[in-house]
Amino acid sequence: MIGIIDYGRGNLRSVEKALWKLGYPAKVLESPAELMAVKGIILPGVGAFADAMAALEEKGWIQPLIHYAHSGMPFLGICLGMQVLFEVGEEHGEHKGLGLLPGRVVRFPAGRKIPHMGWNTLHQEKPCRLLEGIPDEAYFYFVHSYYVASEEQEILAGMSDYGVPFPALVGRDNVWGAQFHPEKSSPWGLKLLENFGKWVNEDATVSSHRS
């Protein structure tokens, strides 16, 4: 079972529907106590960085999410859910993120229409399990005004460009994030969600064999 975190800032039902369509059971989690019942989680999100962190704090999600990330189980952030994985966001002042990945979330420079909205290509920087079966320069759907700035090359799996190059798929170990919306990016976004579902199933199988 894949859990989708409900903190009042995400496109929950479309992600849930996409996973079920792909054959991967999913449920929306309304409280941290439900984390124990799932083998992987997705943190969606739309809106402002500061509002998202405030909502996560208000609903008691922050420490449970950090603990879950450290447990080694698959964790995927989508759009704003990817951005809050990082250390600091600069939207409406400087705000602390979850700190699971190194970097800052900054505004696109002037000169381009903001938000960056629509289809854009993903240039694959390195192989990763989420990109298995997806061609280089495949198109994905984006909606965002801020982007991640990180000097940690190791976490950059895919890049896109909107006046400046920006990380579109990031991660290491079990914590990953997609700046685009895979649930709106058929067919390749659904392939990425399928790869995540396979990873969750494989990880759960390995864990059950160990126990």
UniProtKB/Swiss-Prot annotation:
One of its GO terms (molecular function) is imidazoleglycerol-phosphate synthase activity. Its EC number is 4.3.2.10, 3.5.1.2. Residues 1-206 form the Glutamine amidotransferase type-1 domain. It is found in: Cytoplasm. Keywords: Amino-acid biosynthesis, Cytoplasm, Glutamine amidotransferase, Histidine biosynthesis, Hydrolase, Lyase. SUPFAM superfamilies: Class I glutamine amidotransferase-like (SSF52317). It holds the Pfam family GATase. IGPS catalyzes the conversion of PRFAR and glutamine to IGP, AICAR and glutamate. The HisH subunit catalyzes the hydrolysis of glutamine to glutamate and ammonia as part of the synthesis of IGP and AICAR. The resulting ammonia molecule is channeled to the active site of HisF. PANTHER family: IMIDAZOLE GLYCEROL PHOSPHATE SYNTHASE SUBUNIT HISH (PTHR42701:SF1). This is Imidazole glycerol phosphate synthase subunit HisH. The gene is hisH.
